[in-house]
Amino acid sequence: MMSKLGVLLCIFLVLFPMATLQLDGDQTADRHADQRGQDLTEQQRNSKRVLKKRDWEYHAHPKPNSFWTLV
């Protein structure tokens, strides 16, 4: 009976907190990325700006004899 209690205590007091603390491990990486200026909102603004500049008419309506009309 005491060994079962010891196993339960080991699981809930040692192993369970170790497993749950690893889930928060990515927070420091996110903080460093923000300090380097890799903000996601800035990346989204840049990607929208690039997409507006590109001529997507060619991709939306390919020429009749192009490869993409066969697909």
Swiss-Prot record:
One of its GO terms (cellular component) is extracellular region. The D-Phe is essential to the structural conformation. Residues 1-21 form the signal peptide. InterPro entries: Conotoxin (IPR004214). Residues 28-39 have a biased composition (Basic and acidic residues). It holds the Pfam family Conotoxin. The modification D-phenylalanine is found at residue 67. Belongs to the conotoxin M superfamily. The lineage of its organism: Eukaryota, Metazoa, Spiralia, Lophotrochozoa, Mollusca. One of its GO terms (molecular function) is ion channel inhibitor activity. This is Conomarphin-Mr3. May act as a neurotoxin. Expressed by the venom duct. Residues 22-54, 70-71 form a propeptide. It comes from the Eukaryota. Keywords: Cleavage on pair of basic residues, D-amino acid, Hydroxylation, Neurotoxin, Secreted, Signal, Toxin. The modification 4-hydroxyproline is found at residue 64. Negative results: the unmodified synthetic peptide shows no or weak activity on muscular and neuronal nicotinic acetylcholine receptors (alpha-3-beta-2/CHRNA3-CHRNB2, alpha-3-beta-4/CHRNA3-CHRNB4, alpha-4-beta-2/CHRNA4-CHRNB2, and alpha-1-beta-1-delta-epsilon/CHRNA1-CHRNB1-CHRND-CHRNE). The keyword Secreted applies. Residues 27-48 are annotated as: Disordered. It is found in: Secreted.
